[in-house]
Regions:
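Active-site hotspot residues in diverse enzymes, especially metal/ion-binding acidic/histidine motifs
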Residues: 1-250
Length: 250
């Protein structure tokens, strides 16, 4: 596994998707802009973090919506590696526990933190929050909040860069959410998607359904059926009501 090559790939993909080399990214918005990509959020169970399916006819990424928001962001970055750089398979089901024997999974797991927190940006952020001193638990939380990464992902990233020791994992893993709140941060990063929103589809599939609707190629009942298949009852049953008021949304 070539870490420099993976870091370079992460930078290249950020640029391809219209992001600069250093800023924190709204990775879900970026994914929604990828031509032909359907993004599905679904409770995938205790063992699966996500999956990527790609061939000449479709591109699909699924994310386990019962994981924390920070872990979902990491998993999406992981799946983007499979989508753009993994030539071994067109179908990847990714376990929450990394199998070190599977090279493309190791590469995807290394790619993800490089995409979310590029090296130069991470180094600058560390300098800002910790100066030249040791990195404390509070500093780790500040960094993960800035880059939108799960606590463990940020901890291991700092270990890989030599800022922390893996022996400190237990000391840095207790009371994370309560400390984040105490420090004034939103705790969204550490929580799963609310139960009522854990089944959702975005991206290309919905654009295709809308194209069918605009061209009047299928019945309104069929449109509703397609939307319900994508867990978008909010659109199937709420779109007309939302539009009738004519109120501008700020």
């Amino acid at each position: 596994m070539d870490k420099l090559d993976l870091s370079t790939k992460a930078q290249e993909l950020r640029e391809l998707l219209g992001e600069d080399a250093n800023s924190p990214v709204d990775i879900f918005s970026l994914a929604n802009q990828i031509e032909g990509l359907t993004l599905v959020f679904y409770p995938l169970g205790e063992n699966i973090s996500g999956m990527c399916v790609r061939d000449q006819e479709m591109k699909l990424i699924a994310i386990n919506s019962t994981m924390s928001y920070g872990r979902q962001r990491f998993s999406l970055a992981h799946e983007l590696y499979h989508l753009y750089f993994d030539d071994e398979s067109g179908f990847n089901v990714c376990s929450k526990r990394l199998d070190p024997k599977i090279e493309n999974e190791r590469c995807a797991d290394q790619f993800a933190p490089y995409f979310l927190a590029p090296y130069k940006s991470l180094r600058a952020a560390i300098k800002k929050v910790a100066g030249n001193g040791a990195i404390s638990m509070q500093h780790v939380i500040a960094l993960e909040q800035y880059f939108g990464m799960s606590h463990l992902a940020m901890f291991w990233r700092l270990v890989s860069e030599g800022y922390l020791s893996s022996d400190a994992l237990e000391d840095y893993s207790s009371g994370v959410m309560s400390m984040a709140r105490y420090l004034g941060y939103d705790d969204k990063l550490y929580k799963p998607t609310p139960a009522e929103l854990q089944r959702r589809t975005y991206g290309h599939y919905l654009k295709q359904v809308e194209e069918l609707r605009q061209k009047d190629l299928v019945s309104s009942g069929k449109i509703d059926e397609l939307l319900l298949d994508a867990f978008r009852d909010d659109i199937a049953f709420g779109l007309d009501e939302d539009d009738q008021g004519g109120e501008a949304i700020d």
